[in-house]
Amino acid sequence: KVPAYCKLPPDSGPCKGHFPAFYYDPVSSYCQKFI
């Protein structure tokens, strides 16, 4: 089962903070980290 946070799109938003987040990559079938 894929965690809910992995289903979110990779949106860094307007914040200038440097916080790691995750999104689901259907090509690799894994959660990918982005900042």
Curated annotation (Swiss-Prot):
Task: List all disulphide bridges recorded for this chain.
Answer: none
| Keyword check for Endoplasmic reticulum | no
Q: Where in the cell is it found?
A: Secreted
Can you name one GO molecular function term for this protein? serine-type endopeptidase inhibitor activity
Chief subcellular location equals: secreted
Transmembrane feature ranges: none
Pfam families from the xrefs? Kunitz_BPTI (PF00014)
Which protein family is named in the record?
Belongs to the venom Kunitz-type family.
Q: What is this protein called?
A: Kunitz-type serine protease inhibitor G1
Species the sequence originates in: Micrurus pyrrhocryptus
